[in-house]
Amino acid sequence: MSLQDPTKEHNNTSPSPKDEKTDYVVDWDGAEDAANPRNWTTRTKTAHVLCVSGFTLYSNLAAVMFAPGAPLLVADFHITSTIVASLTVSIYILGFVFGPFLLASLSELYGRLWLYHICNLIYLAFTVGCALSTNTAMFLAFRFICGCAASGPMTIGGGTIADLYEAEERGKAMALFGLGPLLGPVIGPVVGGFVTEHLNWRWTFYLVLILAAIIAIAGAVIMRETFEPVLLERKAADERVRTGNRQLRARTSDGTRTANQLLLRAIIRPLKMLCVSPIVLSLSVYCAFLFGLTYLLFTTFPAVFGLTYQFSTEQEGLAFLGLGVGMIFGIALFAILSDKLLHQPRGGTLARPELRLVLMVWSSPLVPIGFFWYGWSAQSTTHWIVPIIGTAVIGIGAFLILMPAQLYLVDAFGTEGAASALAVNTGLRSLFGAVLPLAGPPLYSKLDLGWGNSVLAFIGLAFVPVPFVLYKYGETLRKRFPIDR
């Protein structure tokens, strides 16, 4: 145990009030303390990141895996409202809007591990409920709760990576973490199409349930708490019992606030970031529009590949693989370049987090280019591979925008603020992902695929300056609009 005892540093003098504030502070036992998560072995750290990535994979897989089977559920439950029919898919994403704000706050107060386990248990229970639902109200309620629970790993995963890695080591870890959120929506329709075709819509939930149960059990066996304030508080509590010294406290503890005040501050922090920080607001809105545009793009696939190119239900799912290939290419670039760009400046000072945005600066035009490519090639009825290549370009750009943005927020707000910053990002992203696709049918009915996707491309172009501005002025904005962590 590391204790700061001023009597050893100021012999024959009485401690001043300032000295007393640092008496009996419990900290790590030096820089190499094996109990510090940042000193865990590479194997242990990687295992934790893979578990979190697995959590996000099944939670995002479930978002769209059911979509091919939605018409069958609509028929089974005799749903006549088009809005309710759309909600059978999108209400899951709405759970991602509300869940993050509470879960991020709790994780920054009580730790990460127990939240992962509770969210996994809730998710498993209500996925069973979805599979066994007998009416519309039951299904929608269970599906919404599943979405709220599934948002947990999405929200606090970035905080876990901040706990485990120094800033210059986070690139590859974030690339692993990003596999689930970005590949899940691509793989989901492929698997869902085959399952629905050969079994029924209920089996899309049973399949996700089996996968989620396996990953949840692995996480329960492998994972440990990573949040430094919780670990140091436990250490301080053990030392208070061992020594009988009630004055011992953790270095990270806030002795000036009550538990209720700390909880209130933690709950307010994400909303404060959204309202006060231009960085969080601008990046979250950019990511939200991009996420929403991608989900809106998905709404065109049945018409483009099913009607125009005469794909079967199974083949329609394969059309999503263009996005998947693009995202895999983006993952490779991000993993290779992200940490290299965060080079150590001269003089030994810490690299500024804005260096994370370099990839975002160069890749931001790719998404508009991809939408132009996809829209006009589909309208011209070129060979089916041409619009799929356009979606691959969108996939590369999407990954190289979303991941640098999230990693920048992690670096900028640190281990105690990362989850709150990502809660805002995830919440807005999910809101736009649920709402923007509703604009698809009227947009394409009036403008067709060419000009309809051109409108989306122009929206993407409007956001291209955002990473340029934040790269240049982000450090100034962080200092001018600080967030109390």
From Swiss-Prot:
GO CC, any one term: plasma membrane
Predominant subcellular localization, coarse grouping: membrane
UniProt membrane topology term: Multi-pass membrane protein
Gene3D superfamilies: MFS general substrate transporter like domains
Domain of life assignment: Eukaryota
Keywords: Cell membrane, Membrane, Transmembrane, Transmembrane helix, Transport
Record region (Disordered): 1-22
Subcellular location: Cell membrane
The keyword Cell membrane belongs to this UniProt entry's keyword annotation: yes
Gene Ontology molecular function: transmembrane transporter activity
Classification via InterPro entries: MFS, MFS_dom, MFS_trans_sf
SUPFAM superfamilies on file: MFS general substrate transporter
Pfam families documented for this protein: MFS_1
Function, as annotated: MFS-type transporter; part of the gene cluster that mediates the biosynthesis of the trans-fused decalin-containing tetramic acid phomasetin.
Name of this protein: MFS-type transporter phm3
Lineage: Eukaryota, Fungi, Dikarya, Ascomycota, Pezizomycotina
